[in-house]
Amino acid sequence: MPLPAGTTSEKYMNALDRVLDKLVKFKPEFLILSMGFDANIADPLAQFELKSEDFYEITKRTLKATNEFTNGKVISVLEGGYDLNALADSAFNHVNALVENN
C-alpha cells in the first residue's frame, strides 16, 4: 500500500484497515507477515511517523482479521530497522502480538 512520506499512525491504520478488508475477501489459508521496522519515527531512514506500539496494533489487527481463515498459521519475517532501540521496541511489540494470538 503506497503511502506518502510523513504518514501518521492514524493514516497508516486507516489504510491498513482497507487492505485488511480486501484480505478477508481473499480468505488466505496462511499468512506471511514481512515486518519492516524502518517505518518507526525514530529510525534515521523513516519517512513514516509510526511509533513502536503501532507495530503491535498492525500485527494484532492483521491476525484478528485473518485468524478465521488461517487457523493461526503465520510466518513472520523481520526486516529493516536501523535505530537499534526503535528496532528492539518495534520487534518486541510485534512478537507480543504474535504470542497473544496463540
Regions found by a protein language model. Give the residues of each.
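A general "terminal functional-core" signal
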Residues: 1-102
